[in-house]
Amino acid sequence: MNEVLAKGIKAKEVARELVLKSTEQKNEALSAIADQLILETAYILEENKRDIEEGKAKGFSDSLLDRLLLTENRIIDMTEGIKQLIELRDPVGECVSAWERPNGLSIQEMRVPLGVIGMIYEARPNVTVDAATICLKTGNAVILRGSSSAIHSNKAIVAVIHRALKLTSLPQESVQLIEDTTRNSAKQLFTMKDYLDVLIPRGGKQLIDTVVREASVPVLETGAGNCHIFIDETADKQMAFNIIINAKTQRPSVCNAIETIVLHENWAEQYGSELFSSLKERGVELRGDNKAVAIDSSILLATEEDWETEFLSLTLAVKVVSTVEEAIHHINTYGSMHSEAIITENEENVSKFFTSVDAAALYHNASTRFTDGSEFGFGAEIGISTQKLHVRGPMGLPALTSTKYVIRGNGQIRK
């Protein structure tokens, strides 16, 4: 029996045990994991260093290396996320709705775990912690399949989680890692519908598209982040500068960083040159349309591919438009339905933008960088869904549950 199948069978078995665990037992396990991560930080960082060194030898980009990198502060952030998760209400067993029928039947809709969750993701070892802990909180078993680039980090983190779970009432096999990082193991995971209840891909567009295309298991799609900010003609200059710089340069390798700014031509004529200079001072390479190049001749002329690209680096596309409607059309044409923002003092244009733009998260006068489970108050998230069925946006605890109906009677039969 190969690794993927064996772990699928074990996960199905463990899921039946997890559904019986109380909130207190699950929280004790989460607390143990947080403590163990701190206790074994040096070990995790040493294994992460191996991934970084191998990545550099393979010529990985700076943005990929950043996604791969763990630091003491990033591990502390992980544990803080776990502590927030402990404080959140456990949705399992929650009554979503209840009513009584004229025949006396009492019907309740109750939240229950999904069962076994498969998680396939790239580079980021922090996802290993996020996925494991949020699945445990919601009573789900999880099978993790990271990329070869992070294999040492992922193996170390899962080993630490297992050592923590050994001290609790939850089975160690509640969290399992597929150590085979070949394409064959991924392909088998895609098709394990007898053992997986849902598969969640988290990574670049190519990975997500492959999973959606090839999986026979139900997929919760976490889309790529080709995010935009539209600066309307009434936008406050300093606010716009602060938001754009934050949304692009704070951490360009993440999915909620912006990839294109759309400028109203009147605003661009007044402030565009200064904004472009400010971005270039921070190492941003600009690629713009003809109107943007006319304002700053050092800007590279954008191609069709640039509008479609999630750069995940200090590269930013620039589009200049005449109206809010033109901005909305561009965003709906090229956006990935992740996070989109408008900076304006015109409430009518805010209303148009919020009504017409199709995305999981829409912002007025704020950075797109807030599309995140922690920032939304969800605690650790398992991903940001860009699809419309089941759940959309940052996927917190309720996203990893389903419902079942519990009907109580006193002898009723159907006539």
Curated annotation (Swiss-Prot):
Instruction: Write down the chemical reaction(s) this protein catalyses.
Output: L-glutamate 5-semialdehyde + phosphate + NADP(+) = L-glutamyl 5-phosphate + NADPH + H(+)
Annotated GO biological processes are:
L-proline biosynthetic process
Q: Which PROSITE patterns match?
A: PROA
EC number(s) in its UniProt entry?
1.2.1.41
The task this protein performs is described as: Catalyzes the NADPH-dependent reduction of L-glutamate 5-phosphate into L-glutamate 5-semialdehyde and phosphate. The product spontaneously undergoes cyclization to form 1-pyrroline-5-carboxylate.
User: Can you say where in the cell this protein is located?
Assistant: Cytoplasm
Say if the entry is tagged with keyword Amino-acid biosynthesis.
yes
Q: Which UniProt keywords apply?
A: Amino-acid biosynthesis, Cytoplasm, NADP, Oxidoreductase, Proline biosynthesis
Q: Cite a GO CC annotation.
A: cytoplasm
Q: What is this protein called?
A: Gamma-glutamyl phosphate reductase
Spell out the family assignment given in the record's similarity comment.
Belongs to the gamma-glutamyl phosphate reductase family.
For this protein, the record's CDD domains field holds: ALDH_F18-19_ProA-GPR
Ranges that cross the membrane: none
* UniProt organism field: Bacillus cereus (strain B4264)
> Which Pfam family, any one of them, does this sequence belong to?
Aldedh
Q: Which InterPro entries match?
A: Ald_DH/histidinol_DH, Ald_DH_C, Ald_DH_N, Aldehyde_DH_dom, G-glutamylP_reductase_CS, Glu-5-SA_DH, GPR_dom
Pathway field: Amino-acid biosynthesis; L-proline biosynthesis; L-glutamate 5-semialdehyde from L-glutamate: step 2/2
**GO molecular function: any one?**
glutamate-5-semialdehyde dehydrogenase activity
First-listed, main subcellular location of the protein, grouped into a coarse class: cytoplasm
